[in-house]
Amino acid sequence: MGKNDLVKTLRMNYLFDFYQTLLTEKQRNYMELFYLRDYSLSEIAETFDVSRQAVYDNIRRTGDLVEDYEAKLNLYEKFEQRRKIYDDMKQTLNDSKKLEQYINQLEELE
């Protein structure tokens, strides 16, 4: 698995965590098996007695759907921003002015 594949898989895992409740049961099952449990398309197809192409199409469409949700709701983007601010705060625990700036940034995200 290349670096880009790993980055995409990590992003899809996060997007799935944020938006899985908006998906159908079939979409959740396919995404969970493919991205979280690392099943191959063939293994998923065999499990659900469908073609590899059907699984691929469903995963691709569902990936597009969660990306669309993210474009509208920005839950993952805000999560990443908060995580970066928290990391920065940990580095500046002795600098109260910096900490105040970071707290203000967090408040603006909400």
Curated annotation (Swiss-Prot):
Primary role: Might take part in the signal recognition particle (SRP) pathway. This is inferred from the conservation of its genetic proximity to ftsY/ffh. May be a regulatory protein.
UniProt family annotation: Belongs to the UPF0122 family.
InterPro entries according to UniProt: RNA_pol_sigma_r3/r4-like, UPF0122, UPF0122_fam_protein, WH-like_DNA-bd_sf
Superkingdom to which the source organism belongs: Bacteria
Disulfide bond sites: none
Transmembrane spans: none
Source organism: Staphylococcus haemolyticus (strain JCSC1435)
NCBIfam families xrefs: PRK00118.1-2, PRK00118.1-6, YlxM
Name of the featured protein: UPF0122 protein SH1678
